Amino acid sequence: VYNNDLAAYEENMECIEAVKYPYVVIAPSYMIYTQNYDELLKTHIESGADITLLYHSVDNAKEYYLNCSTLNLNKQKGVLSIEPNHGNAKNRNIFMDTYIMKKDLFIELIRKAKAISSAFTLADIINELHNELDVRGVSHRGFFASITDFQSYYNANMDLIDIKAAQTLFDPEWPIYTRTNDSCPTHYYETAQIRNSVVSNGCQVEGTIENSILGRGCIIHKNAVIKNSVVLSGAEIGEGVHVENQVVDKMVKILHVKEVVSDPALPGYIKRR
């Protein structure tokens, strides 16, 4: 386990140096967005900047993205600094932890950061040297979510129930390849009622589902009610059970407890035994 991003880069320096391509794109694993990196690289090269950083402008930074960094920009979208989001302003440019630069500069920054402090991150060394470098920001458009804690995971799932939001993330021309799981279509019984929900294949639904997400192969028995919840694959909700504002983990069975309801502002988590 690496203590920061630079430690990971340093550990894999031999592979990085062996790559023959002149540019690097560094992107995070915990942020969800769609971006054409060919276009972003072209923008970076045409701008003449040393480093290009991707950001997303939001108007709710007081309540959300509190574990993210922000970019302070000048009128020409030059980056003045990278700072933590302290939640003291609603309008912020959330840094998407996405960088483009020449590979040689990337390697140089890693070595300079290591010489200063083992605790330095890539953002730290860019902050340290931003007066010596031409660092520019490029604005991202479309769906964006940062999964930094349980609450943001829940919120991102709820946001993607909205078909308009989902369409800005998922593009038929850019298919997402995942594990194949061949199963039959979901079976909706006569007693089933579904409203504003996303239901995967292979489910059996006899109860009510409202504003929720169901993974593959879930079983929802008669008179069960699921509201504002994320139910992961293989879960079973028993007859007459009410589940609201929850994340239900894979293969969980809720059969005997008849009501599992949390505050909408503090959704609950039901783990598998």
Spans of model-derived segments:
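Left-handed beta-helix
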Residues: 114-273
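Unchanged
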Residues: 1-157, 270-271
